Structures are given as structure tokens and as C-alpha cells.
Amino acid sequence: TLDRSSAASDVYKRQGVRLMHDEALAQPVNVYVQMPSCVPSAPGLELAGATITPDDVAEAMTWPGIIGLGEVMNFPGVAANDPTMVGGIAATVRAGKTVGGHYASPDLGLPFHGYVAGGPQDDHEGTRMKDAAARVRQGMKAMLRLGSAWYDVAEQVKAITELGLDSRNFILCTDDSHSGTLVHDGHMNRVVRHAIAQGLKPVTAIQMATLNTAEHFGLEREIGSITPGRRADFLIVSNLAELSIDMVFAGGRKLAEAGRLVEDMPAYAYPESARQTVRMKRDLTADDFAVPAPAGANSVTARVIGVVENQAPTRKAEARLAVVSGLVESDVEQDVAHIALVERHRATGGVTNAFVSGFRYEGRCALASTVAHDSHHMIVVGTDRENMALAANRLRAVGGGVVFYADGQEKALVEMPIAGLMSDERAEIVAEKATALLEAMRRSGCTLNNAYMQHSLLALVVIPSLRISDQGLIDVDSFRKVPLFVEDETG
């Protein structure tokens, strides 16, 4: 397992990465950690809870469980030789470790070539066959992603099955897989099954999840194949194509059989400071989520973040919204809800308000989450400002997580007290709570596949096209802040 601990560092600084690194080393299975590269992900467009510098990266490269630099997301900065980006990449290269990529733009012209020339060696943000082909042809490893809400393997694998490119240059991966997916459908075995269903030979798909990955990260002398001198990490399966796993061995020890652990996983004691990270100036009220209209307006044309099902990128949308008592209202009939980013690292009391579409909520409801890539403030989406305030205040009280309210009542809660991002409960318990959350959202009209994952990315200002940050509404295509109302820009 490869982990990029960016979330922990965004909230808990370099110390957060070290805590996750140390916990990873204590596990009976291999969990390798990449040092975060972009904290914040887009300087000038957001404020995170911390900053990672090239000196931080250089120090982390000396830690025993660090295998490289994770997800270089500031792709304009790489192409422009930004000193922070260049410094972190250089420190990684000097250490002889791998530079992970994150090029989320559809532009495969000069910006892409400049990014690749800057040093990133892999990328998982492609969605099209030509994205995968372009990365491989430029010497990168194309990582084909299947997460809980991102379905990018089927289209990109055609670079192998139709274009005939060498499968040894491709890696299968997950990204943002929630507990329900992991418990009920699996982790990498789910991705491999899916790749086989798209036409890959079983052995090829397995290779793309094992040996290809190990070689890319310089770990092939330890893992990646069942050969002498490597760790005795292997699976016993009864059906290769379906990847039905009967037993799991790690380091020669049987850890799981018939879908159940046969050894206890060691618990890690996080310090109390890691559980006190939702810092808000005060409880919020409905007024904090109000959007004042321009003076004298009866209606406005607002920019709207358009969620795209099963895809990480959003679209730029617009909607004509009514003004009532001087405030711009959301519109369930147009599928336009309120969205707010609540600052939660420095207790500034800041709330940024905008609008989002695609969730199809009905009635009076709101979802709040402190998992909000990549700076992990609090994101609240709702059709009703009172419910938005209730949801935000509930997360403040429990120390973070995700909660859903409808008609003034709490309908589902998943507590994530560690940095507001992680739970220390067993996976089965978290999965049960996550299932209840998704069901509560469905009862309020949200039929979007894995809608919570979409919610968690709405503030990720390095993935096109329109996002929200503590600085305002961000046009990622042009990397600039834009007005909420179209009239404010056009006059």
C-alpha cells in the first residue's frame, strides 16, 4: 500500500506525516508513505493549516518508510519553475526516490510537456485514452484509477487494448475509496477485477498492480513478485479472473482468511493534539450562510460549481437565481444548492459562500464534512441555511467527520476525530456508518453515485474547472479567483 499523507499535513503540519509514517511502519503489511509536495496545493488561491517546504521534503527523504514525493499538484508552478516546486522535486531526486505526479488539466500541449520536464514520473489524473497514451509516450507511468466515485480505468485501458501500448508502463491504483467500498467490494483486488472485465488478461492486470508498481518505486528487490529473496507477501485465490481471495499472507504470516482477520492489527496511540483540530471561532448561524445580492437586484446570474458523476473534474455552470429580502436563494427546481467553506484551522470565523449543482437534493437538508481536499477546511452543502448551521456546529462538537441533517434532525454521522480526517474505529463500523450516510442522502433525493466523494473534492483547487476555497470561487482553468455573480465581471 502506498499512502500520500497530504491530508494529515494540511491539518497537522509535518508532524502529521511523521505520525502516519510511524504508524505505517508498525503494520504487519507493507504501507509505504510519500511525502506531500503541495501544502497548500495552490499558493495564493487557498490557505491550508500548514506549509510544507523543500527543507521539510529533504528531511522526510531520510525517514525509513518514505519512498518518494507525493502528487505534485501545482502543475502551473512546476512548468514555471516555482522555487518551492523545484526545491521539493530536487530533494527527492537527490535522495534517489520517485516523484509522484498530479496533472489534472486536459491540456496536453506545452503546459503538459513543461510539467513532465519538471520531474514528475507518474500521474493518476487522466480520464481519457489519449491522457494515458500521452503520459506513457512522455516517459511517465500512467496510473489508471478506480475509486469509489472515479471510474477512469475503462476508458484509459484502451491505450493498451486498442492502441497496443506496453502494459509494463501502466499501473492500476485507487484514489479516495471510502470504507464501504473497501469492506464490501475490496481495495486493489476490486481494481484488478475491473481491469480484467475491460479486456486485460488476468496476469497482465495483476502485474499492473504488483510488479509494475514495485519497479516504479524502486521496491522490486523487496516486493512485487513471489520469488526468492522477496518478502513472503502473497494471496491464495480460488478464481484468478474474479480474484476471489481465500487467504492473505504478509511477511510469511497468515493475516486473513475467508474475509476475516486472523491476527489483530496493532493500534496506534495518536496524541490528544491530533484530536483537537476543528478550530472555529464560534458556533455558526443561518446568517453565516447567507449570500447578499447586489443592491436593487431581483435576480442574479450566479456561477455554479457543476458536479460530474463518476468524474473528479467539475464543470462551469451558471444559473439565474431569485433574490428574496436581499439574499440570493438556492433553487431545488434547478438543482442548485448552497455551498460554503468554513475555515477551521485558525478560528478566523471565515465562511465563503457559493452555489453548486449535481447533488439533486430535495427538501430541507445539508451535508457537512471536514474531509475537504486539499486544505481540509469544512465544506457544507445544503438547500437550507438552518440545516447547514446545524451540520457545521455538530462537526465542531465531535471534532470532525461528516454529518447529514434533514428537517432539523441529524440523520447520519461518521466521526473522524483524528485531524478531522480519520477514524480510529474498526473498518466494519465505519463502513456501516458510511452506508447509513449515503442512505440518508438518497432519502433526500441525492442519487449521485458516491456523492460524498464528490462533496469532499469541491475545494480541491488544482482539479478543473470551478472550485471553492477560503479565498473565494476559483477558476482552475485560469488559476484565478472569479466573482460569484456573472454581472460583477461583465458589468
Predicted segment positions?
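Residue-level marker for buried hydrophobic side chains located in beta-strands
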Residues: 33, 99, 172, 381-384
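Acidic, glycine-rich active-site loops and adjacent beta-strand->loop/helix elements
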Residues: 9-10, 35-41, 148-150, 212-213
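Active-site glycine-centered loops adjacent to acidic/histidine catalytic or metal-binding residues
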Residues: 175
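Metal-cofactor-binding active-site regions of metalloenzymes
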Residues: 27-46
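Active-site microenvironment of metallo-dependent hydrolases
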Residues: 183-199, 203-491
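Single conserved hydrophobic/aromatic residue that forms the stacking wall/gate
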Residues: 1-8, 12
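Histidine/acidic residue-rich metal-binding segments in metalloenzymes
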Residues: 19, 51-71, 77-144, 151-172, ...
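Metal-dependent catalytic neighborhoods of phosphoester/phosphodiester hydrolases
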Residues: 14-19, 44-45
